[in-house]
């Protein structure tokens, strides 16, 4: 009997791939994302798909904004994926490919694919939606909802601010994919609310950094000795 991996196993594997300390402001998000990805990975009904991959990448990029040192972000992302036995390069590539496949495809095509019993063509997004529709059991996740929302917002930017249009899109797709609309809306409302909090936090951090910079400049200026006039020599005095 195969032993089911535990959260502790996932965390241990994460720290094997990334042992540096993570800034406290971001540590909680990284831990929560790791646990969420782990619980899905060990769920018998869960199946990885490109929309889910886009949700991972989008969520990570959104909530890790402002992290310093920024050059450590790829390593942290890699460790997250390795922690749940996923290939970080594949996750990134799948996210990129499904986002690209959504370009220039109207919502009507999405709806048709989500209601179809058979894949048609080679469009990754449409085939993913068809595959989900055909699946006997589809394990919904918050990360899938974020991926779907990202695609919708990229297709129609009004989705971000137009509640009625966003609700209409989500209602149609949730019905066809047999998703709980209440869960989808609740998860996305929380996601959007948290994004606003991140923006506010970044503004506070920027203001604090600017205030600290000005303080240091002021201190440096106040401690710089003034240039004194050279004293007049005896010879110069006698000449005058």
From Swiss-Prot:
Gene Ontology cellular component list: plasma membrane-derived thylakoid photosystem II
GO terms, biological process: photosystem II assembly
Going by the UniProt record, its keywords in alphabetical order are:
Coiled coil
Taxonomically, which superkingdom? Bacteria
Tell me one Pfam family matched here.
ThylakoidFormat
- Spans annotated as Disordered: 212-240
Which InterPro entries has this protein been placed in?
Answer: Thf1
> Where in this chain does the entry annotate a coiled-coil region?
186-222
HAMAP family per record? Thf1
Spell out the family assignment given in the record's similarity comment: Belongs to the THF1 family.
Q: What does this protein do?
A: May be involved in photosynthetic membrane biogenesis.
List the protein's name: Protein Thf1
Protein species of origin: Synechocystis sp. (strain ATCC 27184 / PCC 6803 / Kazusa)
- What lineage is on file? Bacteria, Bacillati, Cyanobacteriota, Cyanophyceae, Synechococcales
């Amino acid at each position: 009997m195969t032993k089911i991996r535990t959260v502790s196993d996932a965390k241990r594997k994460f720290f094997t791939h990334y042992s540096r300390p993570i800034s406290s402001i971001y540590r909680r998000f990284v831990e929560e994302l790791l646990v969420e990805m782990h619980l899905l990975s060990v769920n018998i009904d869960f199946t990885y798909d490109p929309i889910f991959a886009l949700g991972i990448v989008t969520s990570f990029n959104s909530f890790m904004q402002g992290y310093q040192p920024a050059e450590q972000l790829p390593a942290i992302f890699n460790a997250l994926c390795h922690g749940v036995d996923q290939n970080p390069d594949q996750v990134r590539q799948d996210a990129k490919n499904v986002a690209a496949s959504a370009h220039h495809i109207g919502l009507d095509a999405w709806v048709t694919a989500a209601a179809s019993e058979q894949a048609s063509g080679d469009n990754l997004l449409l085939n993913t939606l068809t595959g989900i529709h055909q699946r006997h059991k589809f394990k919904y996740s918050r990360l899938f909802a974020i991926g779907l929302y990202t695609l919708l917002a990229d297709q129609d930017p009004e989705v971000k601010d137009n509640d009625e249009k966003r609700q209409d899109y989500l209602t149609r797709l949730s019905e066809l994919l047999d998703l709980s609309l209440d869960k989808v809306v609740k998860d996305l409302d929380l996601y959007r609310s948290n994004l606003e909090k991140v923006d506010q936090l970044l503004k506070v951090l920027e203001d604090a950094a600017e205030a600290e910079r000005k303080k240091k400049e002021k201190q440096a200026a106040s401690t710089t000795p003034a240039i004194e006039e050279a004293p007049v020599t005896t010879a110069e005095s006698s000449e005058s």
